[in-house]
Amino acid sequence: MLYDLAHPLAEQFFLFNLFRYITFRSGAACMTALIVSFLLGPALIRWLKSVQRGGQPIREDGPERHLLEKKGTPTMGGVLILAATGISTLLWTDLRNGYVWAVLLLTLGYGGIGFADDYLKLSKRNTKGLPGRVKLIGQAVIGLIAAIWIMSLTRDPLSTGLAIPLLKDVLIPLGFAFPLFGMLVAMGASNAVNLTDGLDGLAIVPTIIAAGVFALIAYLVGNHVFATYLQLNEVAGTGELTVFCSALIGAGLGFLWFNAPPARVFMGDTGSLALGGALGGVAIATKHEIVLAIVGGLFVVETISVIVQVFWYKRTGRRVFLMAPLHHHFEKKGWPESTIVIRFWIVSFILALAGLATLKIR
């Protein structure tokens, strides 16, 4: 909105010329989201505590100390992330850009599904929430619409192509299967972040790191000069997603202020499903879906641990891990929560560097 207001004045007042630069608006978006989080956070947490007298329902079969340490902590803090990201994005992006709206659809749509899930968990006082089938159908519909939208904005042959990291000029044509592929990327990213969100600060920092990587990727592939130099597939218009990712980073940092151990609020499915959807949407738009699996490798491993646990238990009646997802396995082994969280952050940072390396190694 501010971009649209300032752009016509850029010729008369040189300060307004700053609004033309994605880098300036990205920094402003990050700071705006951070400030919004700080301003809204305390009041939102007080309100959530007042309406959620028992806090987030805790799994009875989970680590025993969760029943003692985390009981009574309110959930649905993802509302704060969505509000800060949404306000900042609307203020600082070029609202004529279709990629921004497609990614916002995924973010807010998946956040809405998570909100309904959290609400049902609280109202029924159990950990079930929305039926799994209903949740997946909702995610599939929103993901499919967003993927088709993004495909319609992208030039051929990129619109339906899958780029392979490390290999230049290699584009696998998916054709009419691309919307289904994009849908699966969005759903997979969303649910992977959701599974990772089990300890204070565990999911939000890897999300911030991934958003930082994709802010850079969006800037590079949206810029003809940089995309040509690095031999990346140029996707005109995706530079605006740098502003969105920056807003996401600011909102994530603001949320971490309140989610740092011991957490005053949990993001709930409202936040985790939305964050994963946002990352998936940016990856689809920038044609870096496989790089997302590298940068978000922690989320991938957490998801695989659940799949392996369920599959092996159904086949043999035995468990591979003491408890899934993987972070609970280490809890059961006696690792302190802070140790697990910080080590997982370090792994995320290393994976982010690996993902960034694919941009140069060709």
From Swiss-Prot:
Pfam families reported for this sequence: Glycos_transf_4 (PF00953), MraY_sig1 (PF10555)
What EC number(s) does the entry state? 2.7.8.13
Give the top-rank taxon of the lineage listed in the UniProt record for this protein. Bacteria
Q: Which reaction does it catalyse?
A: UDP-N-acetyl-alpha-D-muramoyl-L-alanyl-gamma-D-glutamyl-meso-2,6-diaminopimeloyl-D-alanyl-D-alanine + di-trans,octa-cis-undecaprenyl phosphate = di-trans,octa-cis-undecaprenyl diphospho-N-acetyl-alpha-D-muramoyl-L-alanyl-D-glutamyl-meso-2,6-diaminopimeloyl-D-alanyl-D-alanine + UMP
Q: Cofactor(s) for this protein? A: Mg(2+)
Q: List the disulfide bonds.
A: none
GO CC terms: plasma membrane
Keywords, in A-Z order? Cell cycle, Cell division, Cell inner membrane, Cell membrane, Cell shape, Cell wall biogenesis/degradation, Magnesium, Membrane, Metal-binding, Peptidoglycan synthesis, Transferase, Transmembrane, Transmembrane helix
Q: In which pathway does it act?
A: Cell wall biogenesis; peptidoglycan biosynthesis
State its location(s): Cell inner membrane
Q: Topologically, how does it sit relative to the membrane?
A: Multi-pass membrane protein
Name one process (GO BP) from the record.
peptidoglycan biosynthetic process
- Chain segments annotated as transmembrane: 28-48, 72-92, 100-120, 134-154, 170-190, 201-221, 241-261, 265-285, 290-310, 339-359
This entry's Gene Ontology molecular function terms read:
metal ion binding; phospho-N-acetylmuramoyl-pentapeptide-transferase activity; UDP-N-acetylmuramoyl-L-alanyl-D-glutamyl-meso-2,6-diaminopimelyl-D-alanyl-D-alanine:undecaprenyl-phosphate transferase activity
Grouped into one coarse class, the protein's main location is membrane
Keyword Oxidoreductase annotated: no
Its annotated function is as follows: Catalyzes the initial step of the lipid cycle reactions in the biosynthesis of the cell wall peptidoglycan: transfers peptidoglycan precursor phospho-MurNAc-pentapeptide from UDP-MurNAc-pentapeptide onto the lipid carrier undecaprenyl phosphate, yielding undecaprenyl-pyrophosphoryl-MurNAc-pentapeptide, known as lipid I.
Q: What family does the database annotate?
A: Belongs to the glycosyltransferase 4 family. MraY subfamily.
Name of the protein this chain belongs to: Phospho-N-acetylmuramoyl-pentapeptide-transferase
The species this protein belongs to is: Granulibacter bethesdensis (strain ATCC BAA-1260 / CGDNIH1)
Q: What is the lineage of its organism?
A: Bacteria, Pseudomonadati, Pseudomonadota, Alphaproteobacteria, Acetobacterales
